[in-house]
Amino acid sequence: MFRFKFLKKPKFYVWAGFVLFLLVAAPIAIDFSFEELYLHTERFQNHRSARPATVAVVPGASVYKNEPSPVLKDRLDCALELYHQGKVRKILLSGDNGSIYYNEVKPMLLYILKNEVNERDIFVDHAGFRTLDTLVRAKEIFQVKDLIFVSQRVYQPRAAFLANKIGLKFQAFEADRRIYTSGPFSRIREFFARTLAWVDMNLFKTNPKYLGDPFPIEGSGIKTWKGSVL
C-alpha cells in the first residue's frame, strides 16, 4: 500500500508552514503597501481640490435594468462635477461590454448625455474589463498622459498603483456619496484584487485583454460610441 512517508518528515511541515505563511503574509503586505502608496497620492472628495487634468476616467460598475447602480451613478455624477467645473476637458467611460447580455457602457453614456456635456468630449472604451485594462488602454489607445480617476475610496489604491507602474499622472476623486450595501464584500474582494494587480504588474507583466490602434483623447469621441447608441 502506498504511504505518504513524506508526511512523517519534520522538514515537510517546516516547508508547508513557510508556504502557508507566505500565502497569508504576502497579500497582507501587498495590501498595506498599496495603502502606503495611496497616502502619497493626490486625492480628494471635492472638485475644488483637484488640479486641472485632461480627462476624468470613470470605470464601470454594475447596472440594473439598464440603469447605473448607486455606485456607478455616484462615479458619473462626480465626473460631471469635474467637467462642469472646468477641471477636465474630456470624460472617458470604461466598462465591460463583452457580452450581448451585459453592457455597462451604454447606460453610462446615456446618463452623461442627459447632463449637458459636449458630445465630442465623451469617449467610450468598451473593453474596460478590469482596472488594469482601463488604465493601460487609456494610455495606449487614447494616448492619455494625465487623468483624474473617479471611483470609490476602496478601489483607488489599486488604481494608483497601476497608474504609477505604467507612468500615468494620476489624481483620485473619491466618489463615495453614500453608504453602499456592497461595502464589506467590496473590501474583501479588493483585498485579493490588489494581490492580483501586484502579480500582474511585477511577475507576469499582464497586458489588457484587447489593445488596438490609437484614438487620441484630444479629438472627438463620438466614433467610440459604436455599440453603445450608434
Q: Language-model segments: which ranges?
A:
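A general structural signal for short secondary-structure boundary/capping elements
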Residues: 99-104, 170-174, 193-200, 217-222
